[in-house]
Swiss-Prot record:
GO terms for molecular function: spermidine synthase activity. Keywords: Polyamine biosynthesis, Spermidine biosynthesis, Transferase. Residues 1-16 have a biased composition (Basic and acidic residues). S-adenosyl 3-(methylsulfanyl)propylamine binds at Q76, Q107, D131, E151, D182, G183, D201. This is Spermidine synthase 1. Belongs to the spermidine/spermine synthase family. Putrescine binds at Y106, D201, S202, S203, D204, Y270. The gene is SPDSYN1. It comes from Arabidopsis thaliana. The lineage of its organism: Eukaryota, Viridiplantae, Streptophyta, Embryophyta, Tracheophyta. The active site is at D201 (proton acceptor). Residues 1-35 are annotated as: Disordered. It comes from the Eukaryota. HAMAP family: Spermidine_synth (MF_00198).
């Protein structure tokens, strides 16, 4: 039995862009102006190169064997290609979202860092995560009774099911209720205290994901969580985005009255090779994110394949920060 899917047209909003249409103005040879997307990519014979104003002065490249899909949804450009070294690759608006080789690191950590930190989570909300990888990981927890998921872009869901079946296997779980719509609006309409955990699997704070990094969104998350409930959100790279991380930490310390922590992990195909997570809990039962208390019963989720990255040791290690980041993040506690 597959996941239930509903379409919430009242939750759907048009693609929003930053100033100047979310674009960089480029000058052509004849002097005319043209626009490039805020995140853009190029293919120079046989290579995909990822560039963005979020990491200026550098590019991240993979050798392309074959382009498998290229489309444009209401919200973003979607590309899937077969790479020479990382398997199939999903790209949104010119930015790599996952590869078959290293997706396990991100999906497992963003899911199990929060869910292994609280006893017996039953009801979970996933915002974003259209590829289905977080659903696959949430489903490993036998205590889960309901998984609500709100993804704004149905094309991402459909493309993942077609090209990344081992990732999108989470959609086959009958506990999943999929809503195609805007996660910001979905949370505003959620009943107060209705979730044990919220996982925000967003892209970078450009275009359709921008609101998922702002204070009103975090306030909606806190309202939707039960006392002692937890949230884990994608929180950028400490090598590239300390200014963004500072803002996220400040907002979360103001809004969440329980525990507030920053963790990070290695994902080779993400910019700088690492990605961070913000983990917070609401006021209520104490949550010690650094010491997992709810181990995964892998025997209950054999159909989802074995864990490839997460374990209890790497869980605790994820909260060990380099000195430069620790200094900045801890300063926000005051």
């Amino acid at each position: 039995m597959d996941a239930k899917e509903t379409s919430a047209t009242d939750l759907k909003r048009p693609r929003e862009e930053d100033d100047n249409g979310g674009a960089a103005t480029m000058e052509t040879e004849n002097g005319d102006q043209k626009k490039e997307p805020a995140c853009f990519s190029t293919v120079i014979p046989g290579w995909f190169s990822e560039m963005s104003p979020m990491w200026p002065g550098e590019a991240h490249s993979l050798k392309v064997e074959k382009v498998l899909f290229q489309g444009k949804s209401d919200y973003q450009d979607v590309i899937v290609f077969q790479s020479a070294t990382y398997g199939k690759v999903l790209v949104l608006d010119g930015v790599i979202q996952l590869t078959e080789r290293d997706e396990c690191a991100y999906q497992e950590m963003i899911t199990h860092l929060p869910l292994c930190s609280i006893p017996n989570p039953k009801k979970v909300l996933v915002i974003g995560g259209g590829d289905g990888g977080v659903l696959r990981e949430v489903a490993r927890h036998a205590s889960i009774e309901q998984i609500d998921m709100c993804e704004i872009d149905k094309m991402v869901v459909d493309v993942s099911k077609q090209f990344f079946p081992d990732v999108a296997i989470g959609y086959e779980d009958p506990r999943v209720n999929l809503v195609i719509g805007d996660g910001v609006a979905f949370l505003k309409n959620a009943a107060e205290g209705s979730y044990d955990a919220v996982i925000v699997d967003s892209s970078d704070p450009i275009g359709p994901a921008k609101e998922l990094f702002e204070k009103p969104f975090f306030q909606s998350v806190a309202r939707a969580l039960r006392p002692g409930g937890v949230v884990c959100t994608q929180a950028e790279s400490l090598w590239l985005h300390m200014d963004i991380i500072e803002d996220i930490v400040s907002n979360c310390r103001e809004i969440f009255k329980g525990s507030v922590n920053y963790a990070w992990t290695s994902v080779p195909t993400y910019p700088s090779g690492v990605i961070g997570f913000m983990l917070c809990s609401t006021e209520g039962p104490d949550v010690d994110f650094k010491h997992p208390l709810n181990p995964i019963d892998e025997s209950s989720s054999k159909s989802n394949g074995p864990l490839k990255f997460y374990n209890a040791e790497i869980h605790s290690a994820a909260f060990c920060l380099p000195s430069f980041a620790k200094k900045v993040i801890e300063s926000k506690a005051n």
